[in-house]
Amino acid sequence: MAEQECPVTNLLLLGRSENGKSSTGNTIIGEKYFEVNLFGRDMDQRCKMFRALIEDGPIINVIDTPGLLESSVSGDYLSKEIMNCLTMAEEGIHAVLFVLSITNRISQREEFTFNTLQQIFDDKILDYFIVVFTGGDELEADNQTLDDYLREGCPEFLTRVLKLCGGRKVLFNNKTKDKGKRNKQLNQLLAHVTDIRQQNGGIPYTENMHRKIKFKNLKYSNVKL
């Protein structure tokens, strides 16, 4: 299939660097394009996009957003950078991957970011959310599944996030060299992306959509006043 005939899927990565966000991007692409150090932290300081060509599948553009969940980042900066990502992805964003780790506790920063995204981009952005859990190797070592992990004690915040995004979740093992396992987790992710496309009528989240939502909310607040 010629590249220009393939559908394009734009995926936006959000999450703390120590959650394996950039490593997840590399796993999706199949190459180590996003730089990470020995501790799994991002080395890049700017939003970057790299492309993967999936055999008999879509063209995948993965956009990484390093540093957006750091404690020093303001809501205004977060909004600006996400808008830059929307501009970078000309066709719009087909899915937002909210990357968490089973080995790290959910921080107040992640709650702040999630709540800020809702405020800035309205609940519509949640229609494109997929929660990606890293640390699949840890669960495999303990002979556990993701559902086992969540049943053991799911924080209230995470329960709310999963409910708001329709329960879309996937477990990633970014350390495995097993091609079959890598393909399986990628296919699970892409199945969620297909679900998002169907639910949204094939329409990605775009900069223009954000402007319309922002104008509508502003108009509504003026009417209330």
UniProtKB/Swiss-Prot annotation:
Residue segments, region G2 = 42-46
Residue intervals of the AIG1-type G domain: 6-214
Keyword hit for Nucleotidyltransferase: no
Q: As annotated in Swiss-Prot or TrEMBL, what is the tissue specificity of this protein?
A: Mostly expressed in pollen.
- Residue ranges of the region described as G1: 15-22
Keywords associated with the record: GTP-binding, Nucleotide-binding
Which molecular-function annotation in GO is an example for this chain?
A: GTP binding
Q: Which Gene3D superfamilies match?
A: P-loop containing nucleotide triphosphate hydrolases
Factors inducing expression? Up-regulated by brassinolides. Down-regulated by 2-aminoethoxyvinylglycine (AVG), high CO(2), isoxaben, and propiconazole treatments.
Read off the PROSITE patterns from this record: G_AIG1
Give the top-rank taxon of the lineage listed in the UniProt record for this protein: Eukaryota
Matching entries from InterPro entries are given as: G_AIG1, GIMA/IAN/Toc, P-loop_NTPase
Q: Where are the stretches annotated G5?
A: 173-175
Instruction: Please list where the region (G4) is annotated.
Output: 134-137
Binding-site residues, GTP:
15-23, 174
Span list, region G3: 64-67
* Similarity section: Belongs to the TRAFAC class TrmE-Era-EngA-EngB-Septin-like GTPase superfamily. AIG1/Toc34/Toc159-like paraseptin GTPase family. IAN subfamily.
What PANTHER family does the database record attribute to this sequence?
AIG1-LIKE PROTEIN_ 48352-49494-RELATED (PTHR10903:SF146), GTPASE, IMAP FAMILY MEMBER-RELATED (PTHR10903)
- What protein name applies here? Immune-associated nucleotide-binding protein 1
**Organism from which the protein derives:** Arabidopsis thaliana (Mouse-ear cress)
Q: What is the lineage of its organism?
A: Eukaryota, Viridiplantae, Streptophyta, Embryophyta, Tracheophyta
